[in-house]
Amino acid sequence: VTGSHHPQGYLCLKLRMGDGSTANQDVIEELEDTMAPEPIGIEGRYRTADIIPDYMQAVASFVDAEAIRAAHLRVVVDPMGGAAQGYLADLLRELGVEVHEIHAGQASGQEEICPDPVEPWVDACERTVVEDGACAGLVTDGDADRIGAVDERGRYIHPHQIMALVLG
């Protein structure tokens, strides 16, 4: 259940497949066909599992950890009060990056920001990167499925431009 980058109060069910991709229309229709028109009360059991350590290890395996450590980076991370709070910053710290995390430890909306990694909501990250002398800033949306960035001069890099950088 997520509101993604929308203001508080907007929630929906966002279905992802096992590989992280969006469900295709056939899967959505099959799911809709099994749903009751009205909520039903079902009691049952559940169990919790701490999947974070394995997930973080998997994410870290995609990068050259030694090169990151050797670079002695300083980065600003802005999870915008959303789902990435603590996780992205902790992952970068484990890779030897000096991290200043802003807009963490609170629900998005406390500072009247929209958890969307686009202008003007990235202004605080832009300022903090320059003030801290950081080499970059990373900004995630509310459910951490999109990312924006800021360069060392405080200039915004749109999520669509990041894909071009990754592919280049």
List the model feature ranges, each with a label:
Residues 1, 77, 99-103, 139-140, ...:
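General beta-strand structural signal in soluble alpha/beta enzymes
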Residues 1-18, 140-153:
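Active-site microenvironments of hydrolase-like enzyme catalytic domains
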Residues 11-132:
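Gly/Ser/Thr-enriched, mixed-charge loops and adjacent short helices
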Residues 6, 23, 85, 145, ...:
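Short, flexible micro-motifs
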Residues 114-168:
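Acidic, glycine-rich loop-and-beta core segments that form the ion-binding/anion-interacting portion
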